[in-house]
A protein has these predicted regions:
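Conserved serine/cysteine hydrolase catalytic core
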Residues: 178-235
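A catalytic-pocket lid/entrance helix-loop region that shapes and gates access to the active site
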Residues: 112-146
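Conserved HGGG/HGGXW glycine-rich cap/lid loop of the alpha/beta-hydrolase fold
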Residues: 7-55
Length: 272
């Protein structure tokens, strides 16, 4: 079995919510937002391969749908037959996949700047698998970067995928870094950087969205990753309550103003 770490927020008898972070992040992504959400029992996970959770065994991969199984295992452990999901970025995508696959288990979806995975059409699948296999052969030669100081690691994270504020990078780093000879490195499994062997097609992804049966609130960041016109048009056709808020991809973590704005949307939504 895999050991999965989590940060718990809110009263034991609060409404059950499982919170899922984005790719290469960890549970600390919710450290500004979660305390502002009232009356909820929030289990903010470090997904496998991230933060303090175990890495998947040798030979296993990190397909996005495997995280849906991890979430269900956690729900089983808490005895939660029905629960809500709070997801950011990749965590929002996993939330939609799970809510589409098992609509009877999910009560509400609260999503931040993420909905459907990167898709790939059938004709590109052989090349995609080829690149993934080659990357897999080379993975053992890859070394994770070592940063001489905590600050250097924070600086690097500020410029990483979905740039974040210094405070946000510090919060992610406090949970995500570990000391090694010569400084610090991220706890994340280097295999998370491998390209996907298979992608869902656009039709696959939309089929999951169409099977979501619960109320869904989606916060889009004005300076986030979902502002391309084509993607925006697609997302605005979904039967979700959509709010656009000022801020970048990590608007819920970058500063108190962003966290407060997201909390206002989700507090009323999760208690309707």
């Amino acid at each position: 079995h895999l050991e999965v770490a989590a940060h718990l927020y809110g009263p034991d008898d609060g409404k059950p919510v499982i919170a899922l972070h984005g790719w290469l992040d960890n549970a600390a992504t919710f450290s500004r937002l979660a305390p502002r959400l009232q009356g909820l029992r929030i289990v903010a996970l470090d997904l496998p391969g991230h933060g303090h959770s175990d890495h998947r065994p040798i030979g296993a991969g990190y397909n996005i749908w495997d995280y849906a199984h991890d979430v269900l295992q956690v729900a089983e452990q808490f005895g939660w037959q029905r629960f809500s999901l709070l997801g950011h970025s990749m965590g929002a995508i996993v939330s939609v996949l799970l809510a589409g696959a098992l609509p009877e288990r999910v009560e509400r979806l609260a999503l931040i700047d993420g909905v459907i995975p990167y898709t790939g059409e059938a004709d590109s699948a052989p090349q995609k698998l080829g690149s993934a296999l080659e990357a897999l052969l080379a993975v053992n030669d890859k070394r994770k970067p070592v940063y001489a100081s905590f600050d250097q690691a924070v600086e690097a994270r500020m410029k990483g995928v979905g740039a974040v504020s210094r405070e946000a990078a510090e919060m992610l780093a406090q949970r995500g870094l570990m000391p090694v000879p010569g400084g610090y490195t991220w706890r994340t499994d280097p295999r998370l950087m491998l390209p996907s062997a298979m992608r869902l097609t656009r039709a696959h992804a939309l089929a999951f969205v169409s099977r979501v049966a619960c109320p869904t609130s989606l916060v889009l960041a004005e300076q986030g990753l979902m502002m391309q016109p084509e993607l925006l048009e697609l997302v605005e056709s979904f039967p979700f309550d959509i709010r656009r808020l000022a801020g970048g991809h990590h608007l819920h973590l970058d500063d108190d103003i962003g966290a407060e704005a997201v909390a206002r949307v989700f507090n009323s939504f999760l208690h309707d």
